[in-house]
Amino acid sequence: ALMVVKVMKIPEPWVISIDRTDWRFGKTVFNVLTLGVVHHGIAFPLVWIMLDKKGNSNTRERCELCNRFLEIFGDRKIDFLTADREFVGEEWFDYLISDPCTRFRIRIRKNTLLDDGQKQLRADVCFQNLQVGQSKVLSKPRLVWQHWLYIAAMRLDDGDLLIVATAHDQNRAIADYAKRWAIET
C-alpha cells in the first residue's frame, strides 16, 4: 500500500472510497471489502479484508478496515470518504462522526426515512419533483440513523434518484459522490 502511494505520487487531500465486491476465480467466489484512494479517476485499493461469508459487510468489518487504513495512513489528509447504499446505519455513522471525524458522502436508499423534527418522510418523497439532471439539497439537516445529516439528491438519466447523506459541505455532496464510481474501475 505504501509503495502504491509512493509510486503514484497521490497528492493530498485524498478521496477514499469503500466498496465490497465478489471476485470469481473458476468456481471459487471471494467476497472482498476494500478501501482505496481515488486518483485520476481510478481507485487504487490500499487495504482490504476477505469476508468469510456471502453478502454485505457489517459495521465491525468496516471499522476494522478503516482502522487498518488509519494505522498505515493516519498522518494523511483525507478530504472525504465515499460509499454506496450498502454502507449505512447508526453504528457506522457513529464511527465516521466520532473523533477524529471522517467526512463522508454516502448514498442512501430511496426508502430511507428522513425526520425533520416534526414528521418523517421517505427520501424519494422529498425529491419526487426533481426532473432528469436536476439536483437539490434540503435546506436543513434531517435525522437519519440518529444523526442530523444534510441530504442532497439528483434525478439520474434512467429516472432513479441519487440521494447522498453528508455531515459537511452539503452543496458539494452530489459532485463529490461522483468520485465514488472510481472504485468500480
Indicate where each model-derived feature is located.
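Single, function-defining residue in the core of a domain
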Residues: 1, 10-14, 25-28, 39-185
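An active-site-proximal beta-strand-loop segment
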Residues: 19-32
